[in-house]
Curated annotation (Swiss-Prot):
Top-level EC class: ligase
Regions that span the bilayer: none
Keyword Protein biosynthesis assigned: yes
Organism, as annotated: Rickettsia felis (strain ATCC VR-1525 / URRWXCal2) (Rickettsia azadi)
Protein name: Cysteine--tRNA ligase
Amino acid sequence: MQIQFHLYNTLSRTKEVFNPQDQTKVKMYVCGPTVYDNPHIGNSRSVVVYDLLYRIVIKIFGEQSVKYVRNITDVDDKIIDRAELLSITINELTDKVTQEFHTNMAYLGCLLPSIEPKATEHIDVMIEIIERLIAKDHAYIADNHVYFDVLSAPNYTELSNRNLEEMFEGVRIENSKTKKHPQDFVLWKPAKPNESANMNFKSPWGFGRPGWHIECSAMSYKYLGENFDIHGGGADLIFPHHTNEIAQSRCAFPDSTYAKYWVHNGFLTVNGEKMSKSLGNFITVRNLMDKEISGEVVRLFLLSSHYRRPLDYNDKAIEDAKKTLDYWYRAIENINVQKIDLPHNFMQSLLDDMNTPLAVKIINDYAKGVFISKTEEEKQLNASAIITCANFIGLMNKTPHEWFNSGVDELYINELLNKRLEAKKQKNWLLADQIRNQLLEEKIILEDKPDGTTIWRKE
């Protein structure tokens, strides 16, 4: 029986059965980071969501049949401003932030994409597309800029489903006097006086750099062609970024539909408020790493809500994710778990528009099953289902011992256990109890076994 994967398509505003153009070459593009500053927790939600989508598509079609492209935006006004503020070169900044991004995503258990192109390495493709747009009267030159003529694009408002005037309310419009229409957007901009040379490039329109939107159109075209299956990103990218991508790509390649399925994840708030540096609630992934919060805890938190719904970061949500993982790891402790086929109900939850809250509940049910199992066989089956399901969504990649004892000085504990064992041999029960209580204060729980051995775990 053919697997049916239902995915919400922003373009049609309905859940559709995912049917790629070629099942042997499934193509997926996701907007990656602009590498001007360390990734924050909101950025990481997008990466984790599309990491899960990638895993599901691989499961259905096979790893060799899926090409996942996630770009690096390393040319942008924010990068120039940030490098100047830090008194470092642009290359130093982009290299440092790109490395930090990779470290952060490894911490969150994300797979690497098939290809990770950098914008600065694809200027020639951007120029090629801009030239096509000019030749087809969809773009024009004004005041050393190249602009896209928004009114020349059929169905410009299709993705956002809003009228043109409403879409541009509150949007800052630059160089409006030089444009045909206020809504037209930049495809190429000239270098500013005294601006860094390595952020600008030669072009038919002079020395300058591309606008943001043309970058993704160029890189998706280079690696996936005129048409591909999935385009993902945060809901904040629906307009203007993704709207403008569609317009310029379809106009440059008139026979193209560009991306077939548009997938967008919801916003992330912090304690109910929008995250911003001015509010002092700007949380980077590095902040969480420095607090020694497990990447698995953060990943589970990010998957705890449906990807299209808003998600609020707060201490309780992180504590709840930690307790859930503790429960799962405790359930498989001292059981010979084996990887099994993904349980049908678990896979069906993910095939229904990536319903991760239901998937997490199903794993919880298997954990409950372990604790109420009447036979060892039943216990092992439930525990094996836990590890199989959790591994599939990028969780539980440690042993229970590693999980419960991370950050613990095992040498120190074992020395105390040896002292306690010696005290017990000499019937010095007072010293033995003192050592137990000392470890308990450090949240280390001891369990004396009938055979005389003692095992320990972190509380």
